[in-house]
Every structure is written in C-alpha cells, then in structure tokens.
Amino acid sequence: MQVLPPGSTGGPSRLFILRPVATTLLMAAILLAGIIGYRFLPVAALPEVDYPTIQVVTLYPGASPDVMTSAVTAPLERQFGQMSGLKQMSSQSSGGASVVTLQFQLTLPLDVAEQEVQAAINAATNLLPSDLPNPPIYSKVNPADPPIMTLAVTSNAMPMTQVEDMVETRVAQKISQVSGVGLVTLAGGQRPAVRVKLNAQAVAALGLTSETIRTAITGANVNSAKGSLDGPERAVTLSANDQMQSADEYRKLIIAYQNGAPVRLGDVATVEQGAENSWLGAWANQAPAIVMNVQRQPGANIIATADSIRQMLPQLTESLPKSVKVTVLSDRTTNIRASVRDTQFELMLAIALVVMIIYLFLRNIPATIIPGVAVPLSLIGTFAVMVFLDFSINNLTLMALTIATGFVVDDAIVVIENISRYIEKGEKPLAAALKGAGEIGFTIISLTFSLIAVLIPLLFMGDIVGRLFREFAVTLAVAILISAVVSLTLTPMMCARMLSQQSLRKQNRFSRACERMFDRVIASYGRGLAKVLNHPWLTLSVAFATLLLSIMLWIVIPKGFFPVQDNGIIQGTLQAPQSSSYASMAQRQRQVAERILQDPAVQSLTTFVGVDGANPTLNSARLQINLKPLDARDDRVQQVISRLQTAVATIPGVALYLQPTQDLTIDTQVSRTQYQFTLQATTLDALSHWVPKLQNALQSLPQLSEVSSDWQDRGLAAWVNVDRDSASRLGISMADVDNALYNAFGQRLISTIYTQANQYRVVLEHNTASTPGLAALETIRLTSRDGGTVPLSAIARIEQRFAPLSINHLDQFPVTTFSFNVPEGYSLGDAVQAILDTEKTLALPADITTQFQGSTLAFQAALGSTVWLIVAAVVAMYIVLGVLYESFIHPITILSTLPTAGVGALLALIIAGSELDIIAIIGIILLIGIVKKNAIMMIDFALAAEREQGMSPRDAIFQACLLRFRPILMTTLAALLGALPLMLSTGVGAELRRPLGIAMVGGLLVSQVLTLFTTPVIYLLFDRLSLYVKSRFPRHKEEA
C-alpha cells in the first residue's frame, strides 16, 4: 500500500480513487443505462413543439362565399370564440367550403381541446343550414403542416370513381386508424355518385320543374325503419325495395304522368354513373390519380407514424386489383432520417477530433485513453436521462451532444493535466491523483455550474421557441453534469492506475518535436503577457473597443428567425385570373406540370385543382414537387425554386408561388410564400379600401419579393334581382327561387344510396352544355300558384357583378393576409422593419389593425427577448460565480471575457453570409459558458497562489496564466473542433446546424487570442480597485 503524503485527501474524488472496482461498476451502470435508453428513444426532426391545432371543415356545395360566411362560418365562430385556451381562430369561406382553424395555447392538451370543439359544434348545429349534406367535420391536424406521406393511386384500366371508392374503403380508413395520424385526405374528388343532368328544354316542354323532379327522386329512394311482425312462434323483419342502387334504376324512375302516359327520369335527363363533384381533379406526374395525403396529429411521433403506415401498405395494396398501382411519392421521414444520420456522423467526427487534440497535447496513449473513455461515457449516459424526460433523438439534441463533446472533455483534460503535472514532479501516481483531483475539484465544480447557469434562461423561454430549445438545453446540461461526475470519479481513478512517470516521460521524435513547439509557444506567450501587464491601459482600451464593436456588429448584422431547410419537398400555389373556370385551370396545370417535370432535380409532381377544405378557390391549384435526394442533384432547394419559376414565367395567365417545406411549422394556413402579414378591419368595405394601398406599398419595397395577398374581390357573379311583388302575385317564394337555382347549378346532393360498405350520393344539376354562361339562367322555370310554370326572367333581372371568391376572418373579423419572401441580400429583420415603416407612412386608421403571423410573429417575439435572454444568462452566471467565490469582484473579472466571444461569433456570421437567427443566438449563449472557463482556470490558480504561497497578485496571475496555458489551449481547441463538423456540414439538414458551428468557431478563435491577455489585466485592475475601496472604507471588508 502506498503511503500518502499529508494533505492528499483527494476531496470528493478520494473514495472513488481508492475503490476502483466500485467506481468501474458505477460507470458500467451509467453506460448500460445509456445504451438501453438509446434503444427506446424515438427519432424526430425537431422536438415536438406543435401548437394544439384543430381544423373544422364544412362543405355546402353550391353556396357562395357570402352564404358560407353568414350561414356556416359565423355561427361556428361564435361558439368557438367562447372556448377557453383558444390562442387564435382563423377561417376561410369560399364557394361551397368553410374551413375554421383553431390554434390553442401550448399548455392545453389536444384531447381537452377536441372535447371543447365537439361541444361547440353541437351548440351551433341548430343555427346551421338544415340542408347541409354533412355536419361540420373536425380533424386534429394543422393544415399548414405538410403531409408526412403522399401516395398516388393510379389505374390504366379502371375509372377514377371506382379507384377512389376502393381506396377510401380499403386503404384510407385503415391508415386513419394508425396511431399518430390526424387526417387522411383523398385529393381528386372522384367519389362515386349517380349524376342526374336535366335537359331544361325537355323539362319545360312537359310543364315540369327541377323542384318537382327533385321531390320525386327524393321520395323514390328511401332507407328507413319498417318494423317487424312478432307472432306467437316466429318474428318476421319487414323490408322493401325502397332503395335504388344504380343509374339504370334512376333512369327508369317515373317522375310524372302526362295524359296518362308515364314520364320517366330518362326522358328529361341524362342519368349516369359519375363523380360526386365534377369540378375536382388530381394528377400525379400528369396522370389522373387519387392523391392520398397523410397528415399527423400535432405532437405525434412522425417516424413511428410513418413506419406503421409503411408496414401495413403491402397488406393494403394486396386487397386492390392488380391494375391499381399505389406509389409513395413523398415520405418526409426519409429526409429526417438522413438529417439525423448526418448529425450522428458529425457527432462521431467531433469525438474523433477531440481525442486527436488530446493526444496531440498529451502525446501519451494512456493519458489519451482516459478522456477517450470519459467523453463517450458522458454522452451515452445522457440517453438514459433523455428517455426519462420523454425526449427524442432529433437534430437539436444531437447538436447538443456534438457541442457537448468539447465541453465534457474539458473536465477530463483539466483533471488529467493537473495530475500529470504532479507525476512529472516525482509524485507517486496514487498520491498525485489524490492531490491533483483534490486541488482541481473546486475548479471542476465552478466550470460545471457556471456553464449550466448559462443554459438556465433557455429553460424559461416562452412560447414555441422555448419549447423548441428546452430539449437542447436540458440535454446539454445533463451531459455536462455527467461529465463532471465522471471527471471527479472515473478520471482520477484511471489516472492513478494508468499513468506513471515512465509513461509520461516516454517520448518519440514526434513527441519531442511537439514538446519543443509547445515550449516555444508558452515562452512567447510569457513574453507577450509580460509586455501586456506593463501596459495595462492599452489592453483595457482593446477590451473596451471589443465591447463597443460587439454592440455595433449586433446592430448591423442581418437577423432571421429559423434557417430555411432543404427537405426535398416544395409546396406550390398556382394562381390564375379570378374568373377562371375549372376546365381552364386544369389546362393551365397541365402546362405548368410539363415545364416542372422537365427539371433535372424534380423526381415527382402532384397537382390538384378544385375547391375543397385545403384549396379555397377554383382559380388556384395546389402543387407538391418532390425533389431527388440531395446527393443526386446539383442544386439546393432555393436554386431549384428559382429555376422552376423562371421556366413557368412564360406561360400566360398564371403566377407560380413556391416554398420549401419546413420541419418547424408555426403557421395555421397554407401560404403562397414563407412569411405572412395580416391587415384586419371591422368591415369588408374598410378592408377593400386599404388592401390595394398597402399591397402597392409593399410591392415597391426592395426588402420584399413575391408579395401577394389572398384578397380576391373580382370574381364574376350573376346577381338574381327578384321582383318580390311579382313573385308574390304568382305565388312564388324566395325559397322556390333558391331551390330552383340550387337544383340547376349547385351540384345538389338530393338523395343518398346506402350500401353495406359505403354511402353514395345522387347529384342533381342542369345539363349546361348547350346553354353555357348566363344564358343557362333563362332555362330556369318555377311553379306558380295555379300549377303552371313561369320562367325566372318573368320575375327577376340578371345582373353581372364582381364578388369576392373567398372571405377570410381572423378572430371573427374580416382579414386579408399578405404573403412575401425575402430576396437575396436582405434578411427577415430588414423586411419586418420595412413593413413597419410602411405602415407608419400610410397612417392607417384606428379601426384597421395589422399583425405579423406565423414564423414572422415568432421572429418578432424571439428578437424582442434575445437581449434579455443574453442578459439573463450573464446574470445567472454572475450569481453562481459569486456564490462559488464568495466575492462580488471575481465574477466580473470572469465575465469580462464575454465581449470577445460576441465579436468573434458575429464577425464569423457576417463573413459566412449567415443571418443572426435563433440557432446562432444559442451558439452565442453557449460561448458565454465556454469562454469564461479560461478566466476561471486562471483566477482559481492565482487566488490559490496568493493564499497559499503568499505571492503578489501580479506574480500570482502571471504564474497562473503560464501554468494553465496548455489546458486552456487544449480545452478551447477541443470545443472548437467539437463545433467544426457543424460549421462544415453539407448534408441533409446542414442549414440548421451550420449557424451554430459558425458562431461557436468564430467566437472561440477570437476569444482564445484576446482573453489570454485581457483577463490578467482586468484581474489586476479589480484587485487594485478592491484595495482602494478597503483603504477608503476600512469598516467595509470584502473577501475577494
């Protein structure tokens, strides 16, 4: 047994140094827990930060936007507006469709929100139109969130109506049942139906009207209870042939008698099997298709949901005929997995680089093995805590672990370097371990808790940004804590067992060359430091200039919100003149699709035309462009978008808006471009007055591009102006007029065909092929009081007017949304400021309000809290350091190093052409924690030298700087190389990781150079200040 010298207690490490078996088993337990935890961690793109969002869709075919607003949307909004926890309510009412999107507070569970929405719908039921084909349908889904998976179903042998029927009953319902799926939509609108197209001339010739025919059809097709017979011995169920199932049966239906002869429906109408809505269509790579979009519930695990769908797809497709082909066009999890894989590779690369730096400095394999064990052990142990906290393996947590490689090795390096110093002086390894670990224990604790203090403000950030970075901050803090434990337990124990004077003194040619190089560097640093200490005011001027420069750079640097990612999917909106019909839009989309599919970066394309819950008007079309994998194309998504827009620009009458899909979705509606700004008024008239003025002003701003609005008030409308007196004299009511028009032109759903598996509709309309346009109104006839028929023209005048194609509300008031992008050379901060300046110039009245939406609103909130976040981090670190040092002065000395980190980070971002977004801001906050460790290591040793060796402050800080130069350089390079893979990242998701790496590498490079000279000067300045205060106020004693 080795005899320990007096005072070699080892501090908190003593027990672990003297009990190597127990220490090894404890570390093995941490390792095992981490490995098991990793297997249970889900994989995601980002932490789950979705707002609880519910979409309520009501379809009322044939209703105008004005009718949808007043009869459907408004009653629902009044009930929804009374719900507690509602953050925002937006609605869009267009021809035949009402979509209300409800976004709740982050703290409200989605299931609770669902219950409140259902109760509100029930309360509004009595106020809704009685002839709604279906009640309002709600889905736990954010409409702005892109589908997690898109499938195209095509067939060369079967009509799309049959294909959709099979897909809906055999595939879509099964996928809807998968845990995590919020909504499955079938774009294409080819739901089977029996279509009855009335021949207006034949109907009029027989003295009939569309209303009498509708009544006849409705009465001829019923499916209701008929009762049963219960005799003394047997019970008999009653049934009848009260249902008609096919177009042929409807064609033979007798609707009236003329002179004793039956008039069948086929005599006055074309009856055929068709689609429920003939103004809907979808195409996959220009082929007619049923496009199935699968959206997840807010908060659901996207990887697990997609995996479940993939597993059941083979079984589901086997139930379809061989002529029906199901193709997965896009799967967002493919890019998510690739991004996570790239980040994992960068994590492993960072570990390798850090270990290489350790070997370069220590030049000793046993000494390198020790931190080489400590780093992965600390990182793997973190997984166990992540499982307990319900975290996931995502880009942010992996970024935290990558950055942590530079942090966690610091503690091990400091311990090893200190113990090695005593062994080289001739101490026995065990004694050196006890003495070195005991001496450095307080420093390790100071480094750990001061670094965690920097992360504390991140945990208290509000709203979605706080939720987003909570996993990042906690993961990093846990890794740092485990690292401190490992460095105070396993590291000194391994040093006592693996290091010796022989191993440390054993050198080869490379080691000797490195040693001579480090000796020359330290000697040069010593000479430079001596000169700096002899000219303190010059150094202080440099430090003060650094502070001013950091403030100036903060002001001028372009500011953004969240990096734009290349996920390989582009969402698009195709816009045409407001009077465009379905047929013209279908033709335009074919032209656009042909141009898009010619691009070498495009892998597949889906397009959709028509009005449904997602597409508001007939003059717009939705597109989803799926790009080839990143390694299979030459350009990033923004270059592809520019190329596609240039290719389509020559097609007359269309405007194409494209934006890349993002993992972080804050918006509540699908927008044409990336950013939104709303203009709201109390009336539509006030809104119509200010929309063109503001739009013209915004379009003139160089900081904005592709400015557009969803305000569409130039749609063509036929106004039927009924002479109520004439109508009353003939016994015709307004309800008769509405019914006649609805029967003719509303694709009215008049009856339901019930089968064992599904329900199908009977659609009534006029055959307008021979009388297109307004001339079709002249064929409308109504039944008068005496039983005769009267043409509509006898009681009404037809006027052509302009009318809105859609009416949008935000929190129950009319609103229009301006969408815009930011051109190259400008930042989101520039665009936001330009819009605010324009708003002031226009001098909007008090009843007109404006507001940024989605990511732009989040950017404003984040920008406003950024300075306070950094101040809070500095204050938290000052409090922790003040408690640890029992001093008001020394924490200020340590914190004086922070401006150097800010200057380096901001300069690096500007040189790299990167914006100061929230990812880069997190990097700057982390730099606050990293850079101050240099000062801590210097000041700890200087105070110890003053206290234990009686040195003067100047000699103490000079010696501390030289003694700690090597570990400072080592730990800084380790942190720098830990961030370097992020800065040089080029794979999937690199846009997210690169700003963090740039900020940290730049900050570390500049701060490493400056703090080695400014810290000792500021230390001596505050020491003299402390002596001055004590001399002036002798009763005031401050322990420094």
UniProtKB/Swiss-Prot annotation:
Major location (coarse): membrane
Keywords: Cell inner membrane, Cell membrane, Membrane, Transmembrane, Transmembrane helix, Transport
Membrane topology field: Multi-pass membrane protein
Subcellular locations according to the entry: Cell inner membrane
GO cellular component: plasma membrane
Entry's transmembrane regions: 25-45, 347-367, 369-389, 396-416, 440-460, 472-492, 537-557, 863-883, 888-908, 910-930, 968-988, 998-1018
SUPFAM superfamilies: Multidrug efflux transporter AcrB pore domain, PN1, PN2, PC1 and PC2 subdomains (SSF82693), Multidrug efflux transporter AcrB TolC docking domain, DN and DC subdomains (SSF82714), Multidrug efflux transporter AcrB transmembrane domain (SSF82866)
Coiled coil: none
Molecular function terms from GO: xenobiotic transmembrane transporter activity
Alphabetical list of Pfam families matching this protein: ACR_tran (PF00873)
Subunit-level organization: Part of a tripartite efflux system composed of MdtA, MdtB and MdtC. MdtB forms a heteromultimer with MdtC.
Similarity annotation: Belongs to the resistance-nodulation-cell division (RND) (TC 2.A.6) family. MdtB subfamily.
NCBIfam families, sorted: PRK10503.1, RND_permease_2
Entry protein name: Multidrug resistance protein MdtB
Gene name linked to the record: mdtB
